């Protein structure tokens, strides 16, 4: 997630970076389960990220025919809802209702338990599914191929990336990663 901060602080606006507050940078750095956001904004980003990922991943898995809506366990759908719209509505309102007038951001135990259970179910049935793993392998190979190509052909990078090497002394490996 350091790359996410690098993008907003160094790469955005053609190398000028964005003038973000400490709270927003904290949210970006600590939006995954491994980080511990120090600010309310960071905690909101963490919850938002979890909600977005689970719903997008369910939607992607259904469109990719890895699962169907009927495959989703009732114990989770009964709490979180049957559609993306329902799940978003329930989770967002649950956070609002459980965080109002409190010093931190909370989700009710039932909704949090269902969301955690849904995530575990997704790991078993989607993320570790051979079809999904095959796509992951192809995506990784594509990134490696692009990386190796641009290391040999830095002259084909957009000018703003080539300039990072010339004016800032950035190493080509770093610039190629930034571009990809």
Question: Each PLM stretch: what is its role?
Answer:
Residues 2-179:
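Histidine-centered, transition-metal-coordinating active-site segments
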């Amino acid at each position: 997630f350091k790359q996410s901060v690098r993008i907003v602080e160094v790469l955005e606006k053609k190398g000028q970076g964005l003038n973000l507050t400490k709270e927003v940078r904290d949210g970006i750095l600590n939006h995954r389960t491994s980080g511990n956001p120090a600010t309310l904004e960071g905690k909101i980003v963490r919850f938002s990220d979890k909600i977005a990922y689970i719903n997008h991943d369910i939607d992607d898995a259904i469109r990719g025919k890895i699962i169907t809506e009927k495959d989703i366990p009732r114990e989770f759908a009964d709490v979180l809802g049957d559609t993306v719209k329902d799940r978003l509505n329930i989770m967002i309102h649950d956070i609002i209702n459980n965080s109002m007038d409190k010093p931190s951001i909370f989700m009710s135990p039932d909704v949090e338990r269902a969301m955690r259970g849904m995530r575990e179910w997704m790991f078993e049935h989607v993320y570790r599914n051979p079809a999904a793993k095959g796509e992951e392998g192809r995506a990784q190979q594509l990134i490696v191929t692009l990386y190796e190509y641009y290391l040999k052909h830095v002259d084909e990078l957009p000018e703003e990336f080539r300039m990072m090497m010339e004016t800032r002394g950035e190493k080509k490996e770093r610039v190629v990663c930034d571009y990809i």
